[in-house]
Amino acid sequence: MAQLNGSNGTGLLYKPRQYQYEMFEASLKENIIVAMDTGTGKTQIALLRIAHQLEGGGPRKLTWFLTPTVALCLQQYEVIRSHLPAVRACTITGLDKVERWKSQYIWDELLKDKQVVVSTHAVLFEALTHGFVRISQLGLLIFDEAHHCMRRHPANMIMLDFYHPTLRKHGRDSVPCILGLTASPVVRSKSQEMKTLESNLDSICKTPQVHKQELTTYAHRPELLPIICKAIDEGPGGRALQALEHAWDTADIDGDPDAIPQNGSLLNGSGEYKALMVRKTLCNEQIKRFVDRSRHIFAELGEWAADYYICTSVEQLRTTIRDQSLTMDWEDEERAYLSNFLSKLPVAEVQANLADPNNFTMSPKLAALINFLDKFDDPEFSGLIFVKQRVTVSVLARLLSLHPQTRDRFRCAAYVGMSVGSCRQDMVGDWHNAKKQRGTMDDFRSGRKNLIVTTSVLEEGIDVTACRVVVCFDKPANLKSFIQRRGRARQQKSTYAIMFSTADEHGDLRRWQILEQAMVEAYQDEERRLREAEAQEAVDENVPEMITVEATGAVITPDSVVTHLYHFCAVLPEERYVDNRPEFSFEKDRQGLIKGTVILPSCVHPKVRRIQGKLWWKSERAAVKETAFQAYRALYEFGLLNDHLLPLTKNPEMRPTDHTTLPSLLDVSEQYDPWTDWANSWSCPDVHQMRIALESNGHPADGLIMKLIGPTNLPPLAPITLFWDRDTRLTLSFDVPERITTVTDNCIANMRTVTALYIQAPRSRNLLNNDDFVTLFGPDLPSTELADWLLRNAGYETAHEAYSRGTMPGAMGIIRDLSRYDEPFFCHRWIESETGLIEIECRPIPRRRNFLHPPALDNGQADAIVESEHGSAKVHMVAAESCTVDKLPVSTAIFGLFIPHIVDRLESTLIANRLCATILCDVGFADIQHVITAIMAPSAQGVTNYQRYEFLGDSILKYIVSCQLFFQNLNWPEGFLTEGRTTIVQNPRLTRAALDAGLDSFIITKALTPRRWIAPLISTRVGAAPVKRQMSAKVLADVIEALIGAAYLDGGHSKAQICTHCFLPEVNRQPLDIPSLITQTEHGRTARHIIDGDLQRHLGYTFKNEDLLIEALTHPSCQHDQTTQSYQRLEFLGDAILDMVIVPIIFQYSNKISPGDMTLIKHAVVNANLLGFFCMEFSIEQDKTKVEKTPDGRFAVKSETQHVELWRFMRFNSLDLQTSRDAALDRHRRLRNKILTSLYHGPSYPWQSLSQLYADKFFSDIVESVLGAIYVDSGGDLSACERFLEQIGLLSYVRRVLLDGINVTHPRNIAQRLSKGDALFNLRRVSDEKGRSMYRCTVTMNDAQIVLVEGCQCGEEAEVRAANETIEFLQRRQEVV
């Protein structure tokens, strides 16, 4: 029993033709029998109907697909399995021993979770007869080869005994819908047959009418040819046949096993005795059938064929006896009797003659066939030969494989179907082997076989490749056979041949000639109707419609609207496997007038996707115009066209008015200088101060508490960390600012003097020409005590004076060597020589003045504060007589080294505060440090810069804009949304927004250079003329994204939204109320009931509106469901949500990860191939029920668990997509273990394996679309989205990348780094020897090729493989060097 357990999701992988849609829609209105030629796609109509039945809602009922044969049953099941991969379907046939299923429990368990059952008619009839299945359980009953529903056939008995009685008793709702499929509704050419068939099936027989012209393009009628052969001359036959007939005539019945007495002698007059007397025993019946078959082979094929058949059959029997010699049961005795009987035949002598290649004695009929086949020498040949008896099939196929005229031209095979009947196989002469022929039809479809000899089993139903030649070795039995066989020859310019003997040439041939003439007349009549239709199309009908837009004067008329409608569809995003052209279909009324319907691509909103014309027309041309006009007007009224009547995608609503292209380098405002305001404030100061404390490695430094004084309110300052050396970390902490109530001018003057003293103390030269500092510093003393403090600490003394007072080195001031231009030193100790010369052992003040960053190398310098001793420090010996000693102690003097850092921090804080008070006044930042970071350009070389925040803000901006566009433009297709988002978030738009807002003046680009630092002065700031600076356009865009990231960190999505609005007014100020927007949207009528509960549980989310999940699983190629939009909109939203979930995780992990590495990690974990891999891996567990035979001969229901992957739920209509999907799944099976090992145990990201996987985009699209669906249904709950990403395994891998430091650098980047940029990659698309597109990548260095990679399926694979080989090459070369 074949089974397909999946979800309830459906999707057709074939895009139906218009005439198939016509028949499908007719089947929705009433029960019909679809009558179309073989090969025109009747099964596709059934698939459409099945999909509609599953998605139609209402009570859950079974769809039962009935076929006349087991082979056809298995074939149709495979069609359903491939076209509707997620449907739960199964087959029930005689191969399952269904006749022995005698328990209701077995049937109930098997069918409880099934949606589609495929079986033969007899299976369903017996199940209904015994009450295991009730007609009321069925929702749709499909009769393949519906012409069988006549007389006492099981197909008709289903209708007679169950359907019609239930219909009469309980009404139409109690019986299933009926869909019949046939190529020949009339079997015996009787006019009454069609009416009888319609009555039996309670259906109307229909063929396409409106789209008949399209149907004719797919129904190629063959040329009908007779093959005339001489009449069969019944002769005595060959040596083997004559010997066989003689042995049969003279056989001694006493040796027959049935003649041997068992349990006593046979009683005279018993049944066994009578059978024995008339030679009706088993063995004699076997021999008789063998003789009859041999005689038939001789008559049909000739002496050679009959001898070959007899000899081969005898050898097969002997082989069977040898293989079963150990089990001598009654059947073996029968075989032994037959073998002994046949041993009288001269097999060895006949076989010797058969080996002679010149001894092909053929019948006239076979000779005529071979001569006919000899005319065909086409490498693309495919043909069928229909014969009457099964025995002829195998022998003729073998003969054609051996004959000199055919053996090298045709690849022959035999096919007689899968059914073995209820009787056991004959022991002699029956060559049928169901297992050997199981792959025959696949071989024929693939071209491995090109000529099949068969019986009537291939007349109908079974999918057979369109043939070049069809030969009837025997005349068709009836009109049905004639039509069915003719339908197999449906290649263009095909041939349909019927063999006749000269004996009946004037009888039967005339009958077929008359029939052919009738067919020709029908063809001619059809051609006449087509010419009449073409003439009707030439009639110019006036379509009086017009669309006018007064605001622009735009006008569209019916004469131009078709072109415009095609243009609208053409500018929609191109999608692989999808044809975006509009599809027109038609219907006719009783007067023959036509009304049109147009269906737009599935990415268009369902409300305007299917538009019907309003009027009836004489010609299709006029109907197309009027229908296209109605569609275009609907698009305009729906908001998908602008006032110029053009698609919004070429002129989005939110496109900025200024389209000027900005250069990459811009002249922008100079960096905002807060000291200008402070300089002006000193004219009327409101003096404030704050205390500054110094700590060293977490411990307070004695005596180092200073004050910062300003002319206005001071902003709170964050602590400053300074790196004195590798082992010493200093921290400057700032107290809360406070106002100084009374400050005299004299005090301010003293403060300026103190500030000058601090700044000058650690420097060698007096760099100060003025002391009108904007910022002032002083000791932690009342302002009234500054004068005394200056007396004690200002100035200097000679080194001898300090030495004579016994001043200890640690309490001394800065030592200045007068012989070296007052170079400052730290005093380490006094040294007095034997001659009385006083020297000072000194150590230099650190030359490194920027203490914001740790030193690259340990310079080993010590200072008096930390009292560190380093033997490696550079020591200077200075004579005391050439030195002076500053009065200001070293412990206080070094504060002058920190003033540039304090002023720089104060400046950046004032700039950030000014930005928050102006442009960002509505945001309300709580932590100004976020703003400082966001506006700090990398060129400023600060402790932080905007790059990390920009990484975060980029995803937040994308998320905010995507959500707004998605929810505020529910009518927009994905292409409009994507272009709208790109217009808003692209760098040129952000750059223009930054300039318009004046953000350029707040971006900090000046680097702090303490060695050349000059304190800001009042005199240089007041009246300074504004200047310009140059800045990269990208920096302006980056800072906006960084500020959005800063706002998010400061106050979540609400502040990020406000911040975005400050720069982009088209973005809402407040986040959308998603729950209220969801409740406003209409729930569709799509198949919510088909969504599997197991799937939702495994997704980690249960949908309130299951339509969203169905939409998320609907590929753009899915055309059969016109009420559900494709997943593209949800995929657009999910793409942004994926970033919004992943990026914060990466950002928050550690600030030690560089922005560049964060970007590499993000790109690696959201890589489409990785998402596609997780999609292939993600599956749910479902129970599968099947019936198995137990050892005691009973039947039992067995349940087992199987995995159903997420991709199976995707709904689509594309054969190409299925082919690509299956190829990708094959690659997945081949690469799966390698990829899993790399993901969960390897040190590096599996770039090469994932590129070889080459997962089609729709695999990753499903992940993103489901993510979008969860977000919408949950009302914008990102945590629900996180749970889904956790379920598929993505978040656990992200954590592993972060925790284990997985190397995610792309191999090409590594190769470029190792080669120092000298490796040049050249990627080309080429064709292989079979004409398939492949990729080749070469790598050259210094004009020499070092790597060549070929035969890759995609450019990514070629490039990655080439990069890895380049890395190996460079590493080997380095080892040699």
Swiss-Prot record:
- Helicase C-terminal domain: from which residue to which, for each copy? 368-531
Q: What does this protein do?
A: Dicer-like endonuclease involved in cleaving double-stranded RNA in the RNA interference (RNAi) pathway. Produces 21 to 25 bp dsRNAs (siRNAs) which target the selective destruction of homologous RNAs leading to sequence-specific suppression of gene expression, called post-transcriptional gene silencing (PTGS). Part of a broad host defense response against viral infection and transposons.
Q: Which cofactor does it need?
A: Mg(2+); Mn(2+)
Which branch of life, at top level? Answer: Eukaryota
The protein's matches in Pfam families, at most eight in alphabetical order, are given as: DEAD (PF00270), Dicer_dimer (PF03368), Helicase_C (PF00271), Ribonuclease_3 (PF00636)
Q: Which GO terms describe its cellular component?
A: cytoplasm; nucleus
Q: Which PANTHER family match?
A: DICER-RELATED (PTHR14950), ENDORIBONUCLEASE DICER (PTHR14950:SF37)
| Keyword Cell membrane included in the entry's annotation | no
Binding locations of ATP:
36-43
InterPro entries in UniProt:
DEAD/DEAH_box_helicase_dom, Dicer_dimer_sf, Dicer_dimerisation_dom, Helicase_ATP-bd, Helicase_C-like, P-loop_NTPase, RNase_III_dom, RNase_III_sf
| Motif DEAH box, chain ranges | 144-147
Domain named RNase III: residues? 914-1052, 1092-1275
GO BP: defense response to virus; regulation of defense response to virus; siRNA processing
Could you tell me which residue ranges the Helicase ATP-binding domain spans? 23-203
Q: Which ranges carry the Dicer dsRNA-binding fold domain?
A: 561-655
The protein's matches in Gene3D superfamilies, at most eight in alphabetical order, are given as: Dicer dimerisation domain, P-loop containing nucleotide triphosphate hydrolases, Ribonuclease III domain
Q: What's this protein's name?
A: Dicer-like protein 2
Q: Where is this site: Important for activity?
A: 1257
Family statement: Belongs to the helicase family. Dicer subfamily.
Keyword ATP-binding recorded: yes
Q: Name one GO molecular function term.
A: helicase activity
What are the cysteine partners in each disulfide bond?
none
EC nos: 3.1.26.-, 3.6.4.-
* Keyword annotations: Antiviral defense, Antiviral protein, ATP-binding, Helicase, Hydrolase, Magnesium, Manganese, Metal-binding, Nucleotide-binding, Repeat, RNA-binding
Protein residues bound to Mg(2+): 1131, 1261, 1264
